[in-house]
């Protein structure tokens, strides 16, 4: 990801995706992406979970649509990510407020959770291992309310993604075959089929 002319844009090797089932997070919209190291494949195990190679990065950016006045909106109408903007699509920062980006990075030692928080100027995101609390004001219909938006710390991220309490290892929980089996941002093609055609996903044996 990078910032270009008031757009948060994706690089060529960053793949945005949508899920069939998602969690509610204080009306925040989410831009989800997968980055796979060049020359490697994602495979699928017998349970329908994806096996990501070391060096993979899964990101989730939380943002809110905003009115011309700058007020944040509790708006569930569609996704504001535009696939045809920038290199691989983008978010128009004149229309949205970025709050946080959570990364899962696959290292040789396993997955690591890294929470990043965007500054008020929307110019950079800083790693906040201890989490953060943002005071946000949100308009929902005729109502306006201020609330504490909580960015989880690394331990809380690991707690949600923990799959083995003994080893304390963590794993991705959202991107599974069943949850990804739908059209993506290109509404004319199933995203799993698109990824196979692009040569970085192998579904054999599933």
Identify what each model region corresponds to.
Residues 46-48, 160:
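Short, conserved secondary-structure segments in the cores of folded domains
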């Amino acid at each position: 990801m990078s910032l270009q002319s008031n757009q948060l844009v994706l690089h060529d090797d960053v793949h945005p995706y949508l899920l069939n089932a998602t969690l509610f997070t204080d009306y925040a919209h989410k831009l989800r992406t997968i980055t796979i190291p060049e020359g490697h494949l994602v495979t699928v195990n017998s349970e329908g979970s994806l096996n990501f190679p070391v060096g993979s990065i899964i990101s989730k950016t939380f943002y809110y649509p905003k009115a011309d006045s700058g007020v944040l909106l509790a708006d569930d109408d569609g996704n504001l990510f535009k696939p045809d903007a920038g290199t691989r699509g983008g978010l128009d920062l004149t229309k949205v407020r970025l709050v946080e980006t959570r990364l899962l990075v696959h290292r040789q030692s396993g997955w690591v959770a890294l929470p990043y928080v965007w500054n008020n100027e929307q110019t950079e995101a800083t790693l906040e291992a201890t989490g953060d609390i943002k005071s946000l004001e949100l308009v929902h219909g005729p109502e306006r309310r201020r609330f504490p938006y909580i960015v989880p710390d690394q331990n809380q991220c690991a707690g949600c993604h923990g799959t083995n309490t003994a080893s304390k290892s963590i794993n991705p929980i959202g991107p599974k075959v069943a949850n990804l089996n739908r059209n993506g941002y290109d509404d004319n093609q199933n995203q799993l089929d698109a990824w196979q055609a692009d040569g970085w996903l192998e579904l054999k044996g599933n």
